[in-house]
Every structure is written in C-alpha cells, then in structure tokens.
Amino acid sequence: MVDKNIYIIQGEINIVVGAIKRNARWSTHIPLDEERDPLLHSFSNLKEVLNSVTELSEIEPNVFLRPFLEVIRSEDTTGPITGLALTSVNKFLSYALIDPTHEGTAEGMENMADAVTHARFVGTDPASDEVVLMKILQVLRTLLLTPVGTHLTNESVCEIMQSCFRICFEMRLSELLRKSAEHTLVDMVQLLFTRLPQFKEEPKSYVGTNMKKLKMRAGGMSDSSKWKKQKRSPRPPRHTTKVTPGSELPTPNGATLPSNLTGGVPFIDAPTSISSASSEAASTVVSPCTDSGLELSSQTTSKEDLTDLEQAGSPREITTSEPGSSEMGASDQLDPQEGAHVEKAQSASVESIPEVLEECTSPADHSDSASVHDMDYVNPRGVRFTQSSQKEGTALVPYGLPCIRELFRFLISLTNPHDRHNSEVMIHMGLHLLTVALESAPVAQCQTLLGLIKDEMCRHLFQLLSVERLNLYAASLRVCFLLFESMREHLKFQLEMYIKKLMEIITVENPKMPYEMKEMALEAVVQLWRIPSFVTELYINYDCDYYCSNLFEDLTKLLSKNAFPVSGQLYTTHLLSLDALLTVIDSTESHCQAKVLNTLNQQEKKETARPGFEAVDGNPETNKSERATSDGKSTGVALDARGLHFPSGGWLSTEHGKPGCRDLEEAGDSGADKKFTRKPPRFSCLLPDPRELIEIKNKKKLLITGTEQFNQKPKKGIQFLQEKGLLTIPMDNTEVAQWLRENPRLDKKMIGEFVSDRKNMDLLESFVSTFSFQGLRLDEALRLYLEAFRLPGEAPVIHRLLEVFTEHWRSCNGSPFANSDACFALAYAVIMLNTDQHNHNVRKQNAPMTLEEFRKNLKGVNGGKDFEQDILEDMYHAIKNEEIVMPEEQTGLVRENYVWSVLLHRGASPEGVFLRVPPGSYDLDLFTMTWGPTIAALSYVFDKSLEETIIQKAISGFRKCAMISAHYGLSDVFDNLIISLCKFTALSSESIENLPSVFGSNPKAHIAAKTVFHLAHRHGDILREGWKNIMEAMLQLFRAQLLPKAMVEVEDFVDPNGKISLQREETPSNRGESTVLSFVSWLTLSGPEQSSVRGPSTENQEAKRVALDCIKQCDPEKMITESKFLQLESLQELMKALVSVTPDEETYDEEDAAFCLEMLLRIVLENRDRVGCVWQTVRDHLYHLCVQAQDFCFLVERAVVGLLRLAIRLLRREEISGQVLLSLRILLLMKPSVLSRVSHQVAYGLHELLKTNAANIHSGDDWATLFTLLECIGSGVKPPDALQATARADAPDAGAQSDSELPSYHQNDVSLDRGYTSDSEVYTDHGRPGKIHRSATDADMVNSGWLVVGKDDIDNSKPGAGLSRPGPSPLVNQYSLTVGLDLGPHDTKSLLKCVESLSFIVRDAAHITPDNFELCVKTLRIFVEASLNGGCKSQDKRSKSHKYDSKGNRFKKKPKEGSMLRRPRGSNQHATRGGHSDEEEDEGVPASYHTVSLQVSQDLLDLMHTLHTRAASIYSSWAEEQRHLEGGGQKIEADSRTLWAHCWCPLLQGIACLCCDARRQVRMQALTYLQRALLVHDLQKLDALEWESCFNKVLFPLLTKLLENISPADVGGMEETRMRASTLLSKVFLQHLSPLLSLSTFAALWLTILDFMDKYMHAGSSDLLSEAIPESLKNMLLVMDTAEIFHSADARGGGPSALWEITWERIDCFLPHLRDELFKQTVIQDPMPAEPHSQKPLASTHLTSAAGDPRMPGHPPLPEIPSEMGVCDSEKPESTRAPSSSSPGSPMASSPSKLSPAQEGPPPLTQPPLILQPLTSPLQVGVPPMTLPIILNPALIEATSPVPLLATPRPTDPIPTSEVN
C-alpha cells in the first residue's frame, strides 16, 4: 500500500508546477521544454522518484524538498509562485512529513532554513509581496517550533532570527506584517529560552572558535551620504574578493572591525525608493550601506554558486565605548568596485528581505564551517555528533547555547539607548523579547549569559530609566524586576544602583518629571519588597555591609515620608508607599503566625512522641525550634479562651542564638543556584546572629565618620579609627592599605597624598602590593594603578610612586625588561606621553608627539637595547586614543564608564557576595526599624482617608503590627499603637453630652474602638503605658452612659437587690428647677416642646443606639474578666492606670474614681489566684481613699464596701488571708465621723464575711480586728487611739514615724508579737515613689512598713506607745457594771446586724475558740451597754445633716467643661447610703425602731446566757484537746478560777447591766436570766474569793445602779426590780454563806449588804420594799445566828463577837426595833469597857492588810483588782481597745500579764487602804454611815469623808496598770 504522504507531495508538486506553467513567463505559444527549465526539470525528477517508492521514509527529506526550495530561491519566480512553494513547505512541516529521526533530516532542515531566509522573487505590488513575506515568516516559525527544528544549526537559527528582525524593523512594511514578525519572534525566543536548561555550557575553547560565526548585528545606519540605491541586473557578474583572515579595515567611526568582503549583488531594488533621512530614522536593516553591517552576497538558486564565499574575521570581538558604535560585532564592507557593477534594473523588480549574517555561510560549503575541534557534541536526545571534514560528510551540530548567547547579546545591544541606530521601536522590541526570555528560562544558571546580564544588560536598563518615554521606562522596570527577582545574588552592586536610581526618581522635585514615572518607580519598589526575603536581604547585604548604602533604612525613611501627603490629599503614590511599608509588616506577621503554628505542632508532636526522644532527634527542624524556644526568654505558647497568646520575648527563629555554620544547608539552598553559598568575609557564618549585625552596623557608622575625617585630614581619620579599635595600634600597613583600596568613599586625592608621603614608604609598598598586574602591559597596569588615587604634581613624589609601582609590576610579570631602571623609564615615558597628547597647555606650545618620536625617545633605554617596537606602538596608540585620567574627576560618559567598571570589579571581588537568607530571618531587626514610620504612616492614612478599603488596609496594618509586637514582646510598640488608635476613637476629645451622638455617627471611630478593644483583649499581655489610654476611653464611655449595665452595676451589702448602679439615674430635673422652668414657659406661653429642655432628636437617639451597639461588640467587660490571663507586669500597669484616677488630681470626678475603683476591685477578684502580687497596690489605694477622707462621700463608701468584698472573697486563700484581715484595720483608721456614716455597709459586710469565712480566721489578732470593728460599728466605740494617732500623723508627705523611731518601752521586743499596722510607711502618699511593690506577707509584716500594734497595745497603750498623755486620769468607779468605754453615737440597725454576726459566732461551737472567747464576751458587754435603754446613746449627738452630699469633702471635684450638665444624683439613689439618715429611722418608723432595739437587747441576753451556760463545757473540751495535742501555746485551764475570771464574771456583769435597763420588759427578763445564771450548778464550784468577787463586781454595782431613778415613768416597775434584786442578794449570800465566812473581809462584806438594805428600805415611795427588806434581813440574821457566826470563838463562853456589835450598830440606824423582835431572849455580853476603840483598828487592820498585800495567804484583797472587770480582764486579748485616757472618766482595762515578766500576778495597789471611820465621828451623827460600804461609789465617799480615799498618783509614778485600758 502506498504511503498517503506521497500523494500529498504529488499534489503539492502539481499545484506549484501548474502555477509556474501558467505564469506570464511561459505564456508564449512555444511548447515548454521541461528539460531546459531547471525548476520544472527537478519537479519531474521528483515525480519519478516518488512513483518508484511506496514509503516516504525510503527517500531523504532533501530529495522531496529540493525542487520546492529551488523555487523559493529562484530570482525569476514571481511572488505568488514563491508563495505556493512556501505553503507547500509549511504543509510538509505541519503534517510532519519529515521524520525527525531520519539521518538526512538535519541536512534537509539546514537547506530549508537557508532557502527560506534567502528567498527571492519578482515583486508585483507591495500588498502581494507582503503576503509572500508573511508566508516566509510562517514557514520560519513552523520550522523552528516543530520537532524537526531541533536539527537546525546555530548558524541557521541566527539567520532565521535575523530574517524576522529585518521584517520587524523594516518601517516601509505594513504594521500588520511587522507585528506578525514581532509575534513570531516572541514565539521563537520563548522556545529557545525554554530549551535553555537542556543545553550544556560549551567549553571556552569551543566558544572562542565558533562564536565568530554567530554575529547578529543590531544593524547600524550610516550617514545618508554613504549609501546609494543599488540597481541590479537579473544576472549580474560575480566579483568575489577574498580577504585573508585577520585583515582589518578602519571604519568611519574609528573602530577597527574584522572585515569580510564578498562580491555579488543580492538585491533587486524596490520600485519605490526611500529618502535617506527617513531610512535613517527607520530601521537599520533594510538597505545596504557601508557600515550597516549587512551582508552583501550574491546567492543564486544553485548551491554550488555559494562555494566561493569565504568566511573571515578576527576571532576577537572588539567593542568601543563611543555612542553610536553600539556593540557592532564583526561587520563587513562593500567592495569598492561593487558600486561600479551596479546597473539599471527592470521596472518589475522587487525588494527582497535583506539577508542575514555576513559570516554565516552554509555549513555544507566548507569543512571549517562546522567547527573542527576534538570534542564530540551530544544533543539532548543523546545522539552523538562527531566532527569530521565535509568530504567525509559532516554531521551538522544541532543548535545550542552559542546561538542563544548570540541572540541574547543581540537583544541586549538593541536596548542600548546611546546607540544612534537603535530607534525607539527597536529598543522596545529588545526589552519585550528580553522580558520573554527572562520569563521563560532560568537565565542565571548559564554563565555565558550571566556575564552579559551583569555588564551590558544592566547598564542599558539603568540608562533607560533616565529616558522620558514612559513605555520604554515601564518596560525597562519590568525587565529589572525579573532580573532582580531571580538573580539578585549575582547582581549585588547592580541592585544597589537600581534602587538608588528608583529612590532618586521618587524624591526628585523636577516639574518635568511626569507623575506616572514616580508612581511606576514606587510600584517597582513595592513589587520588589513583596519578593519573599528581599527586604531582609537588602538589610543584611547593604545596611550590614561596611561600604554599601543603608538601602533598607533609607528606603524605609523615604517611603514613610512619602506616605504623608504634603497637600493633605491622598494620591496613589502615598498609598503605594504605605503598601511598601506594609509588605514588611505583612511578611513578618505571616512568619510569626507560621512560627506560632510550628511551635504548636512541635508541642503536639512532642506530646505524642513521649516517651523517648526519637522525634526530636530525628528531625532537624524540631531541633531548631527546640533550641529556639529553650534559649529565648519565651516559655512557649499558651492557648486559652482568647486564642493564641504569644510569648513575650526572645528570639523565636533560626536567627536567634548564633546558628553556627552547620545551618548552611538550610540557608544555602534558598537561591536559584543550589550550590554552596559563599559567605561574605564580614560575617562569622552564613546566618550571623542579630548581635553580630548590630556590631557591624555600629562599626559601619564609625567607618563612615572615620572616612569623612580622612577626607579632610588623612592622619586624623586613621587616628580616629585606631581609637575606635577599627585599625590596630601601632598602624598595620597591610591593614591600612587594604582599607584604602576597598573603601570607595575615600577621596582619591587624599589617598595620593597619604601614600606618597615620605614617612609612609612602608605603607606605599603595602598599598602597591594590593594590585594584581599579572599579564597586563605596563601602560595598562599604570592606568589601573593611577585610577586608585590622584597622582600628585611634584616630581619627587611621582618618582617615589613610580619606583614602587615598577618594582611590583616587574615581579608580577617575571622581569620582562633588562632591569628596573628600564622599566621605570618606560613608565615615566608613558606618563609624559599622556601629558603631551592630552594636556591643552602643552599642545598649544608644541605639536603632539608622533609614534616615531616616542620610539626615538626610548632608544637604547632597555639596558642599552631597544624595547620591542610592537609594544611601543600599542602603548602609543592606547595612550593617544584614550587618556589616562582620574575618572572620578571627569563627567559624562568617561565617569559613567569608570563607575560602571568599578562596580563590575567590586562585584567580582569577595565584597560582591550576596547572601540569600531564608524567609523570616531577622524579622525582629527589620520590624524594630520599620514600626515607627509604619505606624505613623498608618495613622495618617487612617485619619485622612474616607475610602472603606484604605481604612480597612490601615486597620489590618495596625493589627499585624500588634501581632508582631506581641510575638516579640515589644511593649513600647504596642503601647504606641494603642495610643495612636485611641486618638481615632473620638472618645477622648468629645465633651460628654455630645459623645454618644458624635461617636455613634462616626464609623471610623467605631472601627478604631473595636480594634483597640480587640487588640487589648488579644495582646493585653504586653500593654504597659497604653492601659492609661484605654482606661481613659472606658471612663468616657462610662460618663456618656454607653457601657453595658453589668459594668456599672456593683455589689452592695445594704441594697435589697444586692446591687447598685454607679451612674446617677436620669431625672428630668430637680423640683426647684422644674418650677422655675414651668413658670417661664407659662410666661412665654410656650409649650414644653418649645422650651429649651427638649428631648434628644431621632438622629441622636439613633446615633446613641449605634454607639451602644458598637460598644457591645467591643466587649469592654472582657478586659476585666480576662485580666486573669495577663502577664503580671501588664496587670500591674493596668492597676496603676486605674489607681491613678484618685482624689488628688485637679480635675477629679467622684463618679469616675468610683468606677475605676470598682474595676480595680473586680480585677483583683479575677486575679485571686495570684492576689499576693497585686495586693499591696490595691490595699494602698483603699487606704488612701478611706483614711485620707475628711468627710463622707460616695467614693469612700464604695472603697469601704470594696475592702469588705475583697475580704469576703479572699479569706479562703490561706496565703493572703492574714494580710486581708490586717487590711480591714484600714476601717479603724478612718475618721470616726466618716466611719459612722458607713456603718450600715460595714455591719452588713462584716456579717457576710463572718457567715462565709469564720472558719478561715485563726489568729487572735485577726479576731481582735473583727471584734473591734463590730464594736466600733455596732456601738459607736471610738477606734483605738493608737490607730487614730498614726492615721492623723500620716499627713501627705510627712511620713509618720515607724516603730523604730518611736521611743519604745517594750521589753523583749513585744512589738514583734503585735501583728498590727500603722499607715506610717505602707500607706504612703501616692506622690512618693518607692514603696508600692513590696510584698507584705505575714512573715515580713514588721519590715514591710506596717506599724504592728498587738492586741495588748490596743488594750493597754503604755506610756511608751508614742502617745502624749494628758496627765493622770481622774478616779474611776472600781466596780461598775458597764465596760466604761465612751460610746459614741451608733445606729440601731447596724447594732442589730452586728449582734446577728456575734450570734452567728456564739451559736456555732466551731467558731468559738480560745482566741476569740474573751473578745466575744467583751463585745457582748459593749453591745449591752450600747443597747441599754433602747440604745439611748444612739439618739444623742446624732447629726441630722447626713444627707448624701460631698460639700465639706476634701475630694471635691473642680468643675470641668460640661460638668454643669452632669445629671444630679437622684435623691432616691445614694441619699441614704452613708448616713442611713436619722430622719428616716427616727421619724419614719418609730415603732419598728423600738422593736428593733428591744430585739437587740433580748438577743444579747440570750447570747450571754448561752455562753454562760456553755462556758464550762467549752473550756474543758479545749483543755482536753490541748492535752491530746500536747501543743505549745498558752495553756488552757478549765478550773473554776479561770472560768470565773474569763467567762462567768464578765457575762454576769453584762446580764446585770441589762437589769438596769429603763425598759421594764428588758429589766425583768435580765433579772430572770441573772438569777438563773447565779444559781446555776457550775457556779457551786467557786470558792470564797470568787464569791466575794461576785458580790463586789456583780451584785453590789447592780444594786447601786438600781438606786438611781432609771425609769421615772415606771415607778412601780422599778420598785419590783429593786425588790427582786435585793431578794437575789440575800439568796446568794445565804446560799454561799459557808465559803464566805472564811474570808478575812467577811465583816466588810456583811456591813455592805446591811448598808444596801438600809438604802433600799428608803428608796421606794411604796411600801413594797419597806416590807420586804426587813423580812429578808430577818431571814439572813436568823441563818447567821444559827450558824453561830455572831459568837466569838476566843471569847469566854462564846460570847458575842465584834461582828455582833457592828451588825446591830448598823441595823439600829434604820431598823431600831429589829433586835428586840428577833433576839429578845438573847443577851450578848458587852465587851470589856477598856476596849471600845480596839475594834476599829481591827476592821481597819483587816482592810489594810488585805489591801496592802494581795498575796497574803487566806487574805484576798477586798477591792481585788480595782477594775470593773476584775481579774478576768487581765488576760483578755483585746487588741481592739485603745487607751482612752484622754476622755475623763473612762474606765481602763488592766494590764496584760504577758506584757513583761515583772508584771506577773496582780499589780500592787497604788493607793492607800481605805479606812473605816470611828462610829462616833461627828460627821455621822444622824446620817446613815456612807463610809461603811467602802466598795461603793468613791465619789460619794470622798464627798462625805474627811480623809481622801485614794491618793492621787504622783506624775512621776508609772501610771497604774488599773488605769490602762
């Protein structure tokens, strides 16, 4: 079966042959002889061949292609026929009729490329001709892009490209065709560069020998005069002049170019000629000209005609730096004869495509066309091509790198703006194709291309940045981006120059500079900054390089400055600048996020990988992060309710802690080339740590300063650098020479002066040795040498410099001349020649030296011989053509070339190493440098912009900055950010009344507020200063009533709901105002809606609703609830911010302070787990508010409530409970007047506290505090004076004395035991810094600034306690039922609550402890006294003006703006808060008031009775418990003496006290309780002394009190009470008569009882007592008589005793007949008359001895301990009682026995004994003897007795312990 492809070819043959035959050429009527026409002949041959085969693969591609290609080559065919042939060829390629694997394919492709690129045809009209050209393009495109195209050689590819370029740049062709050519080129370039990675680098030798064939020319149009129209005949004669290789002809522009002259006229001229001018402006490759570089070779259809073409040319590429010459490669020139052979052509001729390369001859022509070298070439498919000569059939080498390099070079040459041949179109085309090339291939991997990029390409691109054509400018920016994106590591200094250029464009103030250029430059910067790691690389490679600009820093400053519009209007440039700044933030933020996630993943992995460390060890990544987290300060990342919390600081990535050079693998493979990255010499390893970079930057600053100083005075500069340690001392010449060579900022003139100095000869030698002169001609070396410094003018200096130079040059080049003198002479001659040739002054005088003269001057200088003439000639021409100059001092191109060559030179040195770093390295350093400018720019843009997107972008920027600062723990950054944002919330600036509407209607403020709160919630950990601003915003929201209800409602003890609002209720206006207003509106006849008091408008209401909604989303409360997650430092700052709103400030507002206080308290409670750390702050603040308050106000009340709330919640925490209870003493330090106003709150608070926490109170001191508080609040007892004195002493800044400063009489350091505090040091004035953050644990309480006052001091302030005492106290009644404290006004409801609290303690046995029992008893007695007569004391002295106001308040606020508009606090709101005002209690509910007071008394009675009955069992259980525990501490005795002293006696006194109440009900109830108590079984254990004490302390004082007219209204009731009391007396006496008889003082006791009988008989007005008393007395006398008490033991016969006499003597005074009634029969003999007076001394002696020596056995003192409380008080831990010596008549408690060893046992009495007066005393005649009841009212005794009963203590005496309370 015949191959279908054969038919396709046959069909194409028929079409082409048919067209040829139809052509006018054959239209004669002569039959065509096909044999004679070569074209038809070859077609007929092909037909025969095709007919003879069945498979197309049986014949070579060349066979079936040749006839078609001959048609294409033929000059005689017309356009349409050529077009048909081209179509056929295209079809063969498209249909893949050519087998790529066939061995003849390569040759076929080569022929095809040659034919199509040299196509000729007879033109018809331009349009038809263009169709043919279009088809040529099509074939060339298909040829290169189909698989068979890979067989093309380098030369063919270059020809193909050149053909396309010609069409593209031929301006006479239509735009469509040109654009098609352009697209074709794009496709071809893309293909070639896409294949680039498949080609391997050619060895240098190969490149050198072959590249000469591949010169594409960026053609050059010469001057118009040079070129003529070429007219050609169809068959011109051939002139081929062979030129030997190597011959050069000078070209018009002075460059010497390798030439190749070929004969032949390849063109048929176009019918329309072009004017010379337009051609010059147009493309460079259309018509021939002498220096256009176009090849003029005659190529006819037969291949053999081409054989006489010869390639020639120098292998060396010569370039010139003059503009215009471009990089013209080897070019050819028209043979001079050529013009003579040009003849007139036919009119039907057409212009053909100008031909391709002058040297690209067909590879089939010559054996040397395929480079002959000894290497085989293997194409990408693995086919090996062996080079051999043509005769053996050369294998054609497929194209590779050489043609790509040539194409690349050509494209670069097109972009040279200084080449006059390059039109704008060409430059643009070049840039476009370079873009395609760079986009398609990793060009940097190819070294041959890299060289071109580094030099010409970058140079042309930078030059294009200065052109004014925006399209070229934009295109060059695009190419630059591609370059630096992919290969910046090879282009360090090029990148520096590029960025500097961009910065210049951005900042230049040139009005001609279009705005768009700046915008594009900025966009280019932004684009670069977005490349990952780019910014970091800028920083590390430039800012951290000694001799580079600080690119990153400068750019950041520039962008920041540029983000601020000068005019106030935001343009794109400003936003672009912001974008650039934000890219740094964005990338850093994303790295931080990644690190956090990575850390979390690591942690998860670690958790799953336990046990064992396989996961950690096996994974280098893990190790790295492990190292990071363990080295840094950070302890990892905690997740909680708020999402992520970032560690506060520390380096978190590889940059932290010096990663050794073991990290190279990680760092090195980031760039395009994965080879080992070179390390810059300035770094210790590939990723230096940040500390090292900072050192380098500091060093760089010093170097710049040193350089500046050197440029003024070299020595000074060197000295400066030596001082700073950058250069060694003494000077190291090598080091300095190196510095002089590598520092580009040094002034060349100064270098010259310094090194040429005679003193620095050694330095000069070192300096010269830094040059490498190997292989350089002397003049070249000299040129290099003299570029490094300015040659001074003096001859000796020049001599020195040249001498050292020539020595070094000789040693580098193996001493080429006879001796050093010859060398020196030649060098000098070169300098002279340079001066002669180029110095204007010299040229004016003499003609410049010729070559001959130069040679002549040097005759015989080379050791007597001549130098080589060629060398001299070369030197002469080099100097003549190019002056040796100091390029830095030149301008224009000379300087530019020099700067560029220096740049290339530096790039090739180790300095040019560009470090690629992994993304995320050095983020912290970069952020530290950029955050300031960025936040400033963000704030500005946020403020000025109205566009939603821009605002969102700014906010996103803020959030990212916050996230980064949180990640790295940068508080200052975060504070700055929060402060900036707070300004935009509009909360700080607005007045309160406008705030809701202004804030509500400002969307930007909403965004800012939400952001502030969101950031504070999320990153509060690192907030410091910023808290103040946030709190200020919160306060504003509070003032404007925009906060959620939960934040303004606070706990309250008294309010029935348990909560009150901190905000005043809205009241329309108070009564007075409204009256006036209504009157005014009535006068003006206006309705209320017209008056000024109008309701808020709907807009305002809507705005307020929006504002409330926004605040709800902000969730400010979260700030408090989540404060428990804050780091301690941040928490302390937050508390500081809240504390700062105190009454000291000028613009203080009470409500604000209360709000801040409440927030502070809530925060403390939220942080109760670590309350110890913040306790000091909050306690100081509360102290300040409570103790400094001069008057009651709402804030004081909130402070008191707050203190109690804290105590209630914190007492459960063991570690802080002691301090918390101690802090409650703050309340005792308050001014009594202020404290009384908050008594309700305190009473309710204490009740709550005891109910919830009684079990957590353990120490006696703490109980003492609580009971003292209960006493002060419940009964108006004044707080202990010791505390008050210290509180007063704490005037602002006075600083009270500490314990150590006070004179102390405490032996044995009792103070350590006291456990109480003064405010002297801790509660310092807040203005004073220093003592705030001390921890105050119990152990350290004494040192922490508390004045520790123990219970003893409070009970018993001794003279040494630092209080001034106003002289001795007046006498006190020793036996009073009352506690004797001066009770101030108190509040019955508070008392009731306190009694409830007491009841709670007493009724629960668990809460009664040895520590609080006596305190409890004492407090009960004080409450009893307070409740007496229905709390009559609470009625006295009560101020009636307690309504809530803060008039006299020290905390008054100054009026501030808008304060008049603050709503007045509603009268119903806080009116009764402080004073629980009397009007309400006294007037409003009198009945309930009395019910309450009655309730109190009954409760107290019940409590006392309960305690009394349970005392014995309680004490015995304690004693038992202590025995089991065998613990130390105070021994607990359960004997009757202890019980009497500590429990029974005081309780009985308390009950007795209530027996004296004015209310009958209470009296009777109390008497019943007393009777029950006295007769209780437990009391039977008491001995005589205790019973005597019972009479003295309980019964006698009771009877005395009842003698007073207690209840005048209830006479009968009083009678009954007195009767019951006297009956009780006699009952008790008789019941315990036996033990009482053992008393030595029995007589006195008995007489006292008789005395009371006497008084009671005469006390009442009714007969009740006068009848009852005699009966009682009779009963007692009879019992005593029966017991033979009246019989004298020693008298003879048991006669009547002295007692009998005294008894009747006393009774006779009031019942004279009783004796007769009772004892008629009984006659007691009188004693001896000689002894009437001896009895008196007896009584006296008894008393005296008893009183004088209390320790006498069997003789307890009658007055015992002279106190109303007796012994029982001596050990009471009543720390809550302060000395009240200043109040006259106040009773004192006895001194504690533990105060000092000397005071054990009862103290000695300090008064003389009482003396019984003789009965015959004249004073007593007819008067009941008042002196007998010595234990009664001493004031009365004193009044009736001639002898003072008590001596007044002398001032020098120590104050009696009995007077100390």
UniProtKB/Swiss-Prot annotation:
One of its GO terms (biological process) is protein localization to endoplasmic reticulum tubular network. Disulfide bonds: none annotated. Residues 227-241 have a biased composition (Basic residues). Pfam families: Sec7, Sec7-like_HUS, TPR_28. Residues 886-1372 are annotated as: Phosphatidylinositol-phosphate binding. InterPro entries: ARM-type_fold, GBF1-like_TPR, Mon2/Sec7/BIG1-like_HUS, Sec7_C_sf, Sec7_dom, Sec7_dom_sf. GO terms for molecular function: guanyl-nucleotide exchange factor activity; phosphatidylinositol-3,4,5-trisphosphate binding; phosphatidylinositol-3,5-bisphosphate binding. Residues 210-264, 289-353, 603-634, 1286-1335, 1431-1486, 1727-1812 are annotated as: Disordered. PANTHER family: GOLGI-SPECIFIC BREFELDIN A-RESISTANCE GUANINE NUCLEOTIDE EXCHANGE FACTOR 1, GUANYL-NUCLEOTIDE EXCHANGE FACTOR. This is Golgi-specific brefeldin A-resistance guanine nucleotide exchange factor 1.
